[in-house]
């Protein structure tokens, strides 16, 4: 394994290196590691991964590792099934092509091996080994060779097909590839005759189709509701049907027919006529092979009707041939049994009937056909008149004419025509035996109506195309299945018909030509015949009575007709109108259903596209994020790897790295590695210093002295050795010089001896040249000719090669141009997608900016409203101050209590105190109270400004504005109400308080709301509010100038003291305010009704009159309680004040 995770291109390069050195398993492991690594799955495009995938699959095919190829294909599908489907398709097709090529090569190799074995020894072909092997296993040499060489590759190819089908079965982008691979698998089964694999393949495809039908209502994946999917599935099943018929697997063919019928029934569009014709043709073939001649004829009849109605270029010869085929198939149907065996013995079993009904559904028939119904349909379509002259009388001979003596001869002529006819009539040959059996049965029935007994020899003469055994078998079968009364006498060699008078043939008349009834039939119908004869006799004896009855009946019928003709006519017209309305209604319903279905499908498609687009965007973002992370990680790893390589070049670096494992190195970065390197260097330097110091200590004085004594001896030895070496060299050099002089002398003497041979050498060379001159010239001439031929050949080859090179260069240019255009198209599509994404981003930003602007606008409006409310509040405060000054001036006068009107009750009557003169509080007290009120008002503003701003916005400001515009008593709440102690209070010793006690003037510590006029403005006893004073004034009955009684005044409660002893309303505000907040209290205060129109309460003026209110209380306000009990403490005792 590699030390670090390799990049795909590096892995491919390393895999090629492994392949070159003959290690494919190592190469496959290297490539497989790339696909298993999740880091690289989505970081590279298909241009990088696709070559690696081809190499990976090539190695899997070479090594027959189908399970490893499956793993890689599934990983590749997950990576590129939504990015580039063409790449996935190319990879799968290339993988299957490689597997097929290797399988074909193995087949050729197996055949070649068998051929070599057969040609090994021509004299002894059957060797003892081959004889023993054939005796043991029963196989020949080809089978054994295929099992050894071919079978492993066939198994690998089959597994490859199954893996690819499983890979693509739910991928909506690869439906075409899925069905192409299914057809390739069918061809594989046909080529190698793999019947068991074909059955498993059919089951697998049927399971896939069932899964698609179950999940058809999902928004993703393959949907069977799509027209394209239905057509692809139908074409694949038709191909499956053809393959099953070729392999003679009739059970699989029948299942394929059921699947085809289900797909055609599921489709909303009518199949094309060509498909239906192919379907009926294959269905007729399957019924023929199954021996079901009835449904075989019915399928051929449906095919004939379809071809005759829809095929425009149908020739007369084709029509005659098809008509003859249908006629012979229909007439060859065996005669039906009067009492079938399942009716006799298995009467409760409905399986045969259900099976027939199921087969009829495959043909599109409402009920199972019968021989009589098919013959009737053949006659209706005028098929007997459309056939050629040879078959035109066949229907009359078998079904109409009664001629038992010549029946078999006539049928034999038709049989001879079929057998000796052209090749076109070969399709009719399978019907000959069935036609003969039907003819024999017709002959036996007709003979039984003419003769009571007949000899075997005579019957065999009439039935010319069967022998005695076949005839006897047919007689027994006719008795068994058709309830014919036949008795065979083998002693007399004759046959008896209808001799038993106790049995009847059937309850209905038999089909086919008849001459007379059988004796048993005559016995059964004797009473019927007697009734017929008697009826005829009565009509002869009384001819007029029957005529009168008929005339009377005719008159009644005419009279009845005239009575009901108008009603019936209207009913018929109404029925026609009802039918038309019903048709229109059904048509509208169908149109509405189709539109709804189209809308639903469009909506589902739109949702699916949106979901798919969103998912693709998310995946794209995820891939970009992972790619960015992988790039950062790769940069880090690259720098780390470079740093490690740099450090490993030094000795201390190797030593430091040897102490770390791979995981430890991966956890470190470059800085940490450099730091450890520096630490290692420092540690080694310290160790070296310590070693040097320890060695220095070990060297002693004796060692140094010994070496000093050795120095002169070494110098003397070297001097003597130098002298000896010089003497040896001089002796050696003298010897070499002497040897060289001797060798020179010997060489000169040898040369002098050889100079005498020069003339002989020259003569020999001249003679040799003269002898071989002609041979040399001949060879030169041949060489020149061969050279010229070779030159011309090479020139021609060079011309052809250059032409081919130019053609290949042109093709490469075209291919490069095509690839360049495809790349440009892809880049343009990518640019469009990026532009669309950018447009969506800009649109989202515009929407955000629009919402931000709306928010700023709304915020500006709220600030403007708050500013206006603040201005109104300041203006109202100024007006209150002015009105307070005016009210203080009006109260500066003394007023006797006896000056009140007579109609107003006295304070003593209401409160139980003595009648006396009371005067208001001194000016100083009023000033104190005014200052307290101002102080309290400020506290109220400080305390409830934020809370009252919403109430002002909702109720107060608008109501004040309306009052000002209407010109009403807008300043009524500004008039300072006189204290209850000055208007209707009792004397200090026995006075009470009406409508709530006033606080003491000495209560300088009290907060806002203690005084009645301040509470009216800031707090109504249920929470601070503004703008609601008019409603509160209505509750109190309005302001009064004099001391008259208030209209809503309650009976005063005795407190046992003066007005100071009365409980203050503001002493316990928390108890007065219930759970639910200030808004509910304000709503309840607003709901309070004012004084009735025109009722001033005695003594009020226009300033104190409340403004009229038009709004009505809401349901929420009406449901809330009108009374509330507030409790507050005063002077050590508990009192209860009930407010309305």
From Swiss-Prot:
Residues 590-632, 826-1140 are annotated as: Disordered. InterPro entries: EIF3A, eIF3a_PCI_TPR-like, PCI_dom. Residues 1091-1101 have a biased composition (Gly residues). GO terms for biological process: formation of cytoplasmic translation initiation complex; regulation of translational initiation; translation reinitiation. GO terms for cellular component: eukaryotic 43S preinitiation complex; eukaryotic 48S preinitiation complex; eukaryotic translation initiation factor 3 complex; eukaryotic translation initiation factor 3 complex, eIF3e; eukaryotic translation initiation factor 3 complex, eIF3m; multi-eIF complex. Residues 590-624, 826-903, 925-965, 1000-1019, 1026-1053, 1061-1087, 1108-1130 have a biased composition (Basic and acidic residues). PROSITE patterns: PCI. Pfam families: eIF3a_PCI_TPR-like (PF22591), PCI (PF01399). Belongs to the eIF-3 subunit A family. RNA-binding component of the eukaryotic translation initiation factor 3 (eIF-3) complex, which is involved in protein synthesis of a specialized repertoire of mRNAs and, together with other initiation factors, stimulates binding of mRNA and methionyl-tRNAi to the 40S ribosome. The eIF-3 complex specifically targets and initiates translation of a subset of mRNAs involved in cell proliferation. This is Eukaryotic translation initiation factor 3 subunit A. It comes from Drosophila willistoni (Fruit fly).
């Amino acid at each position: 394994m590699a030390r670090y995770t390799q990049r795909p291109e590096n892995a491919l390069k390393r895999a090629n290196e492994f392949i070159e050195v003959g290690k494919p398993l190592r190469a496959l492991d290297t490539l497989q590691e790339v696909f298993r690594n999740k880091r690289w799955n989505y970081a590279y495009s298909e241009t990088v991964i696709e070559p690696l995938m081809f190499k990976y699959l090539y190695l899997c095919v070479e090594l027959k590792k189908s399970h490893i190829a499956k793993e890689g294909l599934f990983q590749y599908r997950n990576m590129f099934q939504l990015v580039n489907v063409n790449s996935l398709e190319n990879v799968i097709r290339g993988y299957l092509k490689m597997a097929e090529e290797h399988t074909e090569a193995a087949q050729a190799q197996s055949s070649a091996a068998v051929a070599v074995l057969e040609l090994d020894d021509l004299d002894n072909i059957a060797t003892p080994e081959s004889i023993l092997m054939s005796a043991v296993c029963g196989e020949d040499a080809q089978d054994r060779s295929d099992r050894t060489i071919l079978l492993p590759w066939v198994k690998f190819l089959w597994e490859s097909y199954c893996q690819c089908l499983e890979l693509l079965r739910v991928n909506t982008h690869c439906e075409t590839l899925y069905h192409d691979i299914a057809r390739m698998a069918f061809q594989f089964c046909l080529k190698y005759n793999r019947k068991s694999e074909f059955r498993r393949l059919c089951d697998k495809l049927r399971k896939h189709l069932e899964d698609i039908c179950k999940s058809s209502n999902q928004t993703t994946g393959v949907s069977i509701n799509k027209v394209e999917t239905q057509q692809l599935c139908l074409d694949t099943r038709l191909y499956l049907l053809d393959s099953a018929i070729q392999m003679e697997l009739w059970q699989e063919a029948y299942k394929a027919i059921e699947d085809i019928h289900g797909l055609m029934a599921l489709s909303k569009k009518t199949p094309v006529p060509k498909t239906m014709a192919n379907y009926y043709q294959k269905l007729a073939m399957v019924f023929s092979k199954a021996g079901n001649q009835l449904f075989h004829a019915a399928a051929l009849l449906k095919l004939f009707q379809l071809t005759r109605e829809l095929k425009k270029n149908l020739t007369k010869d084709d029509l005659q041939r098809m008509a003859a085929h249908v006629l012979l198939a229909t007439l060859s149907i065996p005669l039906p049994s009067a009492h079938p065996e399942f009716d006799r013995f298995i009467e409760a079993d409905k399986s045969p009937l259900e099976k027939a009904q199921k087969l009829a559904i495959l043909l599109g028939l409402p009920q199972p056909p019968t021989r009589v119904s098919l013959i009737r349909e053949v006659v209706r379509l005028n098929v007997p008149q459309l056939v050629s002259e040879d078959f035109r009388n066949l229907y009359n001979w078998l079904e109409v004419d009664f001629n038992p003596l010549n029946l078999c001869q006539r049928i034999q002529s038709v049989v001879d025509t079929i057998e000796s006819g052209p090749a076109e009539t070969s399709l009719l040959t399978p019907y000959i035996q069935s036609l003969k059996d039907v003819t024999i049965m017709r002959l036996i029935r007709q003979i039984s109506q003419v003769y009571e007994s007949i000899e075997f020899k005579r019957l065999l003469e009439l039935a010319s195309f069967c022998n005695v055994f076949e005839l006897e078998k047919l007689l027994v079968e006719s008795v068994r299945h058709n309830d014919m009364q036949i008795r065979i006498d083998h002693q007399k060699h004759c046959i008896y018909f209808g001799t038993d008078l106790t049995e009847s043939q059937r309850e209905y008349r038999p089909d086919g030509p008849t001459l007379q009834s059988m004796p048993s039939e005559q016995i059964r119908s004797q009473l019927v015949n007697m009734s017929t004869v008697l009826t005829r006799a009565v009509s002869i004896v009384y001819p007029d009575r029957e005529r009168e009855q008929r005339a009377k009946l005719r008159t009644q019928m005419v009279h009845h007709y005239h009575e009901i003709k108008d009603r019936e006519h209207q009913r018929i017209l109404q029925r026609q109108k009802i039918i038309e309305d019903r048709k229109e209604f059904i048509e509208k319903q169908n149109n509405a259903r189709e539109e709804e279905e189209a809308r639903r499908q469009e909506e589902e498609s739109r949702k699916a596209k949106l979901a798919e687009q969103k998912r693709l965007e998310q995946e794209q973002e995820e891939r970009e994020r992972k790619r960015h992370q992988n790039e950062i990680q790769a940069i880090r790893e690259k720098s780390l790897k470079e740093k490690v390589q740099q450090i490993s070049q030094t000795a201390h670096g190797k030593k430091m790295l040897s102490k770390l494992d791979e995981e430890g190195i991966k956890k470190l970065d470059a800085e940490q590695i450099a730091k450890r390197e520096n630490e290692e260097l420092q540690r080694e330097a310290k160790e070296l210093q310590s070693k040097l110091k320890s060695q220095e200590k070990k060297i002693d004085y004796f060692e140094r002295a010994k070496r000093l004594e050795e120095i002169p001896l070494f110098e003397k030895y070297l001097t003597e050795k130098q002298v000896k070496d010089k003497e040896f060299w001089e002796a050696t050099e003298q010897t070499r010089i002497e040897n060289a002089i001797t060798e020179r002398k010997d060489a000169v003497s040898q040369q002098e001896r050889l100079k005498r041979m020069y003339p002989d050498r020259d003569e020999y060379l001249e003679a040799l040249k003269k002898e071989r001159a002609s041979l040399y010239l001949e060879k030169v001439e041949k060489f020149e000719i061969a050279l010229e031929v070779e030159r011309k050949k090479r020139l021609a080859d060079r011309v052809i090669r250059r032409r081919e090179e130019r053609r290949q260069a042109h093709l490469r240019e075209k291919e490069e141009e095509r690839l360049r255009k495809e790349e440009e198209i892809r880049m343009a599509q990518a640019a469009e997608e990026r532009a669309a994404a950018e447009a969506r981003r800009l649109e989202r930003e515009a929407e955000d900016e629009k919402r931000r602007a709306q928010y700023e606008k709304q915020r500006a409006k709220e600030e403007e409203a708050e500013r206006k409310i603040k201005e109104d509040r300041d203006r109202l405060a100024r007006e209150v101050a002015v009105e307070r000054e005016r009210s203080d001036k009006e109260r500066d006068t003394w007023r006797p209590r006896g000056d009140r009107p007579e109609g107003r009750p006295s304070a003593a009557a209401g409160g139980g105190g003595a009648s006396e003169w009371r005067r208001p509080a001194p000016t100083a007290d009023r000033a104190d109270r005014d200052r307290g009120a101002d102080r309290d008002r400020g506290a109220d503003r400080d305390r409830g400004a934020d809370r009252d701003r919403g109430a002002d916005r909702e109720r107060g400001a608008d109501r004040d504005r309306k009052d000002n515009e209407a010109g009403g008593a807008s300043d009524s709440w500004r008039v300072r109400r006189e204290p209850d102690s000055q208007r209707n209070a009792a004397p200090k010793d026995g006075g009470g308080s009406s409508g709530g006690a006033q606080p003491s003037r000495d209560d300088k510590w009290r907060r806002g709301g203690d005084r009645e006029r301040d509470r009216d403005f800031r707090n109504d006893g249920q929470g601070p509010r503004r703008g609601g004073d008019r409603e509160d004034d209505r509750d109190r009955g309005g302001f009064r100038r004099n001391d008259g009684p208030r209209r809503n005044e309650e009976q005063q409660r005795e407190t046992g003291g003066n007005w100071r002893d009365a409980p203050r309303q503001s002493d316990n505000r928390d108890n007065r305010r219930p759970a639910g907040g200030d808004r509910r209290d304000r709503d309840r205060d607003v709901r309070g009704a004012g004084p009735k129109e025109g009722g001033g309460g005695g003594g009020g003026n226009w300033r104190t009159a409340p403004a009229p209110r038009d709004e009505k209380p809401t349901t929420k306000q009406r449901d809330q309680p009108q009374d509330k009990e507030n409790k507050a403490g005063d002077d050590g005792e508990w009192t209860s004040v009930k407010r309305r």
